[in-house]
Every structure is written in C-alpha cells, then in structure tokens.
A protein has these predicted regions:
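Interdomain hinge/lid region at the active-site interface
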Residues: 214-283
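Rossmann-like NAD(P)-binding element
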Residues: 61-93, 97-98
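Residues at the starts of beta-strands that form the adenosine-phosphate
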Residues: 8, 33-34, 123, 150, ...
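Glycine-rich, N-terminal phosphate-binding loop of Rossmann-like dinucleotide-binding domains
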Residues: 76-78, 103, 155
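Long, positively charged, glycine-interspersed low-complexity recognition regions
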Residues: 288-301
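NAD(P)+-binding Rossmann beta1-loop-alpha1 motif at the extreme N-terminus of oxidoreductases
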Residues: 1-67
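Rossmann-like NAD(P)(H) cofactor-binding subdomain of soluble oxidoreductases
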Residues: 85-139
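Internal alpha-helical scaffold of NAD(P)-dependent oxidoreductase catalytic cores
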Residues: 143-230
Length: 301
C-alpha cells in the first residue's frame, strides 16, 4: 500500500534539490501544498513564479508557524546549516511531522540531529538523493531530476520504521531508486566517488587559474578539461561544508590518490610506457564495466 501523500511539505532550501523534490511530487500529484523557506527573497520569488512552491518565507519571517501541521519537513541546505536548522524546527514540529534532509554527508548530520531534535529524533529519516548538477537555485529545479537516480536513506537504530517507509515511498514517487545504508558506509563510499572528484575539479581549475599565463591555457583547452572540471562550477558553500564534514575519510582518499599519482610519476620518470598503457587499459575497462553501453570522449582532444 502506498504511503499517504504529504498534505503539506515544508522545504527549507528551494534550490536544485529541494525545488526538484517539490516539483516531482507536484508532477506526480502527490503533495497538497508546498511551503518554501530560504535565505534570499529573489530565489524564493523565482520559486513562486515557477510554481515550485505555494508560499514563501525568508528565514526571518516566522516560517516555523508552518511546521505544526506539516506532513514532511525537508532540509535541503548545505550540511553546515543543519545544526541551527534542527534547533530552529524542533520546538515547532507537530506530533506526526516527519523530518528528512538531503545532505551529501550523513554522520555529521545525524550527530547534529541527536543533540537537538529530542523527542522528534525517531521521526527523522536522513536521506541523500545522489543526483545533481553544477547549476543551483530554483531555476535549476526539474521534476525529472531524480528519475532513475539512487537515493540513499541512512536511518538511525531508533528511527520509526513507518517514517522510513513513508520517506522511501515519497522518493520513489519522485522516480528515485531507494537504498538503505549505514551513515558510516554512505560517507565512505561518497567520499571516493563524489567528494574526491569535486575536490580534484576545484583543485585543477584553481591551479590553472593561478598561473600568470592562464589565458593561454583556456584558449587551447578542449572537451577534456571541460568535462573533467565541470564540477568546479558547483555551489562553493555546499561543497566546502561537505568536504569539511567528511574530512577524515576524504583525506584518506586523497592519500590513496596521491599514491596512484606517485606510481604514474614513476612510470613517466622511467619511461615505462608498457606499465602506463596497462594502467590506462585497466582504467578504461573498469569504467566500461561500470557504465556498459557508453563510450567516453577522452580521445577527442
């Protein structure tokens, strides 16, 4: 049996993720009304114009009065903002209101929830939709963003199973493929396959931009640099918070990556083309196995 649709959804953070969640539920006819909460009036006004939300509040406009009869509160903000938001909502939530988030790290978010949510904690279902874009804001929201994408739930031992099932159903109605993981396993996996690639893209663009002749590099750069560094246009505040929150695991992955670079450097220094070619072949085969039916464009440049 399907879970009841949220009668009222309160979304804190009406950007790409929060806005797309609201649009997807609206598109599926699975939500009554949507209240949007944000830091800036301009983005909220755009969300209203695009019919992503039905009512809007900035964070200093008494939005917590909307929480008492909300079915679901989704926190779709940078993870560094979660502790203050948990503290702000806890006293105002209704007895049946479910709380969830869309943060890219989970252990830090859960730790903050444990210290602030009190009796609400069993109705908190941590979540991470693994979908996104380098674009941000309400204008980037899309009802189709989560279709066919992984959504990871990391419930606590004390999380109400009924709340987990309802959140699972709502993400499924958005088109997501829902998986359950521990918070620890989630953060370890996402460090390697998401957080590290973002960090590398930021680092490479930052290093090239700092060169005195950077304009010459941009002039001859092609699809290789463009595709590798697309992530460098991602929201800087959000990714700062993610990297800081998952710093221990991310540093371990950076160390492993440095070791791989050192091995490659040794191959170059010793003119060991056979070893380098073998590494490239293994990497290409691994990517092809991960993404069958796709062919990369790395040879275009």
């Amino acid at each position: 049996m399907s879970s009841p649709a949220p009668g009222k959804l309160v979304v804190v953070g009406t950007g790409l993720i929060g806005g797309s969640f609201a649009l997807a539920l609206k598109d599926a006819g699975k939500v009554g009304s949507v209240v949007g909460v944000g830091r800036g009036r301009d983005n909220l006004d755009q969300a209203l114009r695009l019919a992503i939300i039905d009512r809007a509040y900035t964070r200093d406009e008494g939005w917590t009065a909307e929480l008492a009869d909300a079915t679901l509160v989704l926190l779709a903000t940078p993870v560094g903002e979660m502790p203050a938001l948990f503290a702000a909502i806890a006293p105002h939530l209704g007895p049946g209101t479910i709380v969830s988030d869309a943060g890219s790290t989970k252990q830090d978010v859960i730790a903050a929830a444990r210290t602030t949510l009190g009796a609400v904690l069993p109705r908190f279902v941590p979540a991470h939709p693994i979908a996104g874009s380098e674009r941000s804001g309400a204008a980037a929201a899309s009802a189709s963003l989560f279709r066919g994408r992984q959504v990871v739930l990391t419930p606590l031992p004390e999380t109400d199973p009924g709340a987990v099932e309802r959140v699972r159903e709502w993400w499924t109605q958005c088109g997501g493929i829902v998986t359950l993981l521990s918070a620890e396993r989630h953060d370890a996996l996402l460090s390697a396959v998401s957080h590290l690639p973002h960090l590398l893209a930021f680092a490479l663009i930052g290093e090239l931009a700092a060169r005195s002749d950077a304009a010459d590099y941009w002039r001859v750069a092609g699809t290789g640099l463009r595709d590798f560094t697309r992530l460098a246009e991602s929201h800087p505040d959000m990714w700062r918070d993610i990297c800081m929150a998952n710093a221990v695991r991310l540093r371990a992955d950076l160390a492993a990556y440095r070791q791989q670079l050192d091995r490659i450097d040794a191959m170059l220094a010793s003119a060991d083309g056979a070893a380098l070619g073998a590494l490239f072949a293994r990497s290409g085969a691994a990517r092809a196995a991960w993404l069958p039916g796709r062919r990369g464009g790395g040879d275009v440049d």
